[in-house]
Design a protein with these regions (language model features):
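Hydrophobic, glycine/alanine-rich multi-pass transmembrane helices and their short helix-loop junctions
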Residues: 327, 351-356, 375-391, 441-492
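Hydrophobic transmembrane alpha-helices and their membrane-interface caps
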Residues: 24-30, 35, 45, 347-416, ...
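Surface-exposed amphipathic alpha-helical segments in non-transmembrane regions
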Residues: 14, 21, 25-26, 30, ...
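Helix-loop junctions and hydrophobic alpha-helical segments within the transmembrane domains
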Residues: 324, 331, 335, 411, ...
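Transmembrane helices with small-residue packing motifs
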Residues: 11, 19-57, 77, 113-123, ...
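Small-residue transmembrane helix packing/gating motifs
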Residues: 272-295
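Signature of alpha-helical transmembrane segments and their immediate interfacial
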Residues: 1-33, 436, 506-565
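Membrane-helix entry/capping segments
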Residues: 291-295, 301-348, 380, 388
Length: 754
């Protein structure tokens, strides 16, 4: 097909451009919107609970059997596990990039099933859960009582029943966890009364198993000469505290019966007293929402906000919802800035092109070519599975200056023909394209060859370069298509033959500006030529400058700080509080309240969420706490209130005020899924099978070495094996003499203290 066909048939050129623009708009509307490409490895999490066990027991009896079976699952990259003194076991299995998360979860579940027979009965009774999800927190919100009129059990139960089911149904949500517990019937046994009646906890468990049951008694009247048929119904599981108090434990010799209420205090409480939450000093329950892999983060968060806004309308009086962390806040702010830069770049390019072409008709042609090439790029991004993110948008900002070149070349070529005396813009366009067509294709292929090779790079950095480079290459390809089809047709329509008598007219202000600009440009050009001639004659100086430039390049490459992506102010700060081993829950809340007061005194803080019993950088239990600090909007904060300065200020205050806990403030990671913070996270491994206390000493020595380095500000660890514990030593011989077994003693201990 000859290029003059597009010039002779401008409608064809226009239809091609309109078609690719429509396809680009469709692609833009359906592309996932994220901050960065999904580069985090697919992760499958396995969770188990061994109630009453310490971390060592969890490690040996739960994590070890599970890891033995899970290890080596297909496409596994590495495995990481943690055990807590509250009986919780967490195993994270990381897979190679590109692994199907669904198949990974199925494969891990199959391995977990193989380990079920090796786990304690208490663990299998509660259940071992396997789930796939991204590690990044999509949203953290809290339900809090600003009137302090509800107890924490009611708030947690309301969130579990009314909010979480709605949240989990939102498209794109991978998981939603409540940092709280369900309503449960708490039976607090009285050991002294139990001893009087010669009872042990297993007697109570047996009574509960006998009388707190669901049953299907059946029906009668099914056959025979009956008028009606009836179904027999049993009351089922007990619901009220009084019903549990009436459970019969045993019959007494005097004819009376001993009931559960006689040997225990019964109340409706929490399943476990692991977590405590506060929002701005009020009782609360916090919920963490995780994203499903491949989902549109922007759309998911928008849907979540709609669900929460609707739920807010029906909340009991005094309850409110506070969003502590919202990935959309920074995402929208970042994309807004990139789009703003995109528009500014377009305007600047338009102005520069107009100043040099000095003709509005000529300027319109590149101005039309730019949005056509950029919008069409979104269609190809959709086809190859990319997303709208900061990398692809930044590539388009840079591409503006490149995609405009092809259109300018066409316009300048047609102008050159008109300067030669062509009286027909169509003929000038045809002749110009016969000369420029091959050159446009050649320069386009050369430019694309600069960016396409990065698509073959592997690893995390390769993913970043790939999205940036291929976006550039696609934009350049569409700019060439425009230069071969649309731009020549527009030249034939817009451009007019030069008027030879235009010099006799009175010059307008715009023409006088153009004349002055041309004179200034010619003056600068003469000076430039003079310097070029000077360097041509002084070749040694030219080579010397090149050598000096290379030396400076190497020097600055060595001294310039490096990183994957720059750290930015996301509007959120995370805090991790590590208390001394064995700290009680009441003491933990006292210290966390002091940290909360310290944070509240910072004027840049908008809201704060305190979570006791949960650590973002590791560990669960009373000795760990977390804080989510939401800063005021960027427009409401000064330059001296950016997140880095606030982090430093809070850290220094905490070091001075909080002496009985480690308090660390940090910014959330710029690339989600790799770590809990944007700092360096290291994991040490003991391959010698030595003692935990010796391993802890090695960790402390390593941390001291880190702190001694000038580039390290602080180093902390949540690992500490020195939690205070009582060693229970059972005399097996004495047990046999008494007619009991050691397991009977352990079961009794678990009934009272588990």
């Amino acid at each position: 097909m000859k290029l003059d066909r597009f010039i002779n048939r401008p409608v064809l050129s226009t239809v091609i451009s309109v078609l690719i623009v429509i396809l680009g708009i469709i692609g833009l509307a359906t592309l996932p919107v994220t901050q960065y490409p999904d580069i985090a490895p697919p992760t499958v999490q396995v969770r188990a609970t061994y109630t009453g066990a310490n971390s060592t027991a969890v490690l040996n009896s739960v994590i070890a059997p599970l890891e033995d079976q899970i290890n080596g699952v297909e496409n596994m990259m590495y495995i990481q596990s943690s055990a807590s003194n509250n009986g919780a076991a967490d195993i994270n299995v990381y897979f190679n990039q590109g692994t199907d998360p669904d198949m990974a979860a199925v494969n891990v579940q199959n391995r977990v099933s193989m380990a079920q027979g090796l786990l304690p009965a208490e663990v299998t009774k509660v259940g071992v859960t396997t789930q796939k999800r991204q590690n990044s927190m999509l949203m953290v919100f809290s339900l809090y009582d600003e009137t302090d009129s509800y107890n924490i059990e009611f708030i947690e139960n309301y969130a579990n029943i009314n909010l979480i089911p709605e949240i989990k149904r939102v498209k794109g949500v991978g998981d939603a966890n409540v940092l709280g517990q369900d309503y449960s019937m708490r039976i607090w046994l009285k050991p002294d009364v139990m001893a009087q009646y010669k009872l042990v906890p297993t007697d109570v468990s047996a009574a509960l198993a006998e009388q707190n049951i669901e049953a299907a008694p059946g029906q009668f009247g099914e056959r025979g000469n009956q008028t009606f048929q009836y179904t027999i119904r049993y009351k089922g599981r007990l619901q009220q505290t009084t019903e549990f108090e009436d459970i019969v434990i045993k019959a007494l010799p005097d004819g009376n019966v001993l009931r559960l209420g006689d040997v225990a205090d019964i109340e409706l409480g929490r399943l476990a007293y692991t977590f405590n939450n506060m929002v701005n000093g009020h009782k609360a329950v916090s919920c963490i929402v995780y994203q499903m892999a491949g989902s549109n983060a922007t759309e998911t968060i928008s849907n979540l906000e709609e669900v929460l806004a609707k739920a807010q309308e029906s909340l009991p009086t005094g309850l409110n919802i506070n969003i502590a962390q919202n990935a959309n806040d920074f995402l929208f702010a970042s994309i807004h800035e990139v789009i703003k830069t995109l528009i500014e770049a377009f305007i600047l390019v338009f102005i520069v092109v107009y100043i040099f072409l000095q003709d509005m008709r000529s300027t319109l042609i590149p101005a039309i070519a730019i949005p056509v090439a950029l919008v069409a790029t979104f269609f190809v991004l959709k086809l190859i599975g990319f997303s709208v993110n900061l990398l692809t948008l930044s590539a388009m900002v840079l591409a503006i200056a490149i995609v405009v070149d092809d259109a300018i070349v066409v316009v300048e070529g047609v102008h050159a023909k008109l300067d030669q005396g062509y009286k027909s813009s169509r003929e000038a366009s045809i002749d110009a394209m016969s000369e420029l067509g091959g050159a446009i294709v050649s320069i386009t292929l050369v430019m694309m060859s600069v960016f396409i090779p990065v698509s073959f790079m592997g690893g995390t950095a390769g993913t970043f370069y790939r999205q940036f480079g291929i976006t550039m290459a696609i934009s350049i390809g569409f700019s060439a298509l425009n230069a071969l089809t649309l731009s020549p047709a527009l030249c034939a329509i817009f451009l007019k033959p030069h008027d030879e008598g235009h010099g006799a007219k009175k010059m307008t202000r715009v023409e006088r500006f153009h004349t002055a600009f041309n004179a200034a440009y010619d003056s600068i050009l003469k000076k430039y030529k003079k310097h070029v001639v000077f360097f041509i004659h002084k070749k040694w100086l030219s080579f010397g400058l090149v050598a000096a430039s290379i030396i400076l390049l190497v020097f600055f490459m060595k001294v310039t700080p490096t990183g994957m992506v720059p750290n930015e102010d996301t509007g959120t700060i995370m805090g991790a509080v590590t208390l001394p081993p064995g700290t009680s829950q009441e003491r933990a809340m006292e210290i966390l309240n002091r940290v909360d007061s310290l944070v509240a005194a910072e004027p840049a803080v908008d809201s704060r969420t305190v979570i006791s019993g949960f650590g973002f950088i590791g560990g669960q239990g009373p000795s760990y706490g977390s804080i989510i600090i939401k800063l005021k909007d960027w427009e409401e904060r000064s330059m001296m209130q950016n997140s880095d300065i606030v982090v430093g200020t809070l850290f220094m205050r905490a070091q001075k005020i909080i002496k009985d806990a480690q308090v660390l403030f940090f910014a959330p990671p710029m690339i989600p899924g790799y770590s809990a913070s944007s700092d360096i996270e290291l994991n040490m491994q003991d391959k010698t099978g030595g003692d935990l206390n010796h391993f802890y000493d090695v960790v402390l020595d390593y941390m001291d070495a880190l702190k001694a380095r000038p580039e390290i500000n602080s180093a902390q660890t949540t690992f500490n094996p020195n939690f205070p514990q009582y060693m229970l030593d059972i005399d097996a011989a004495a047990c046999k003499k008494a007619g009991i077994s050691p397991s009977d003693i352990l079961t009794t201990m678990q009934g009272y203290f588990g």
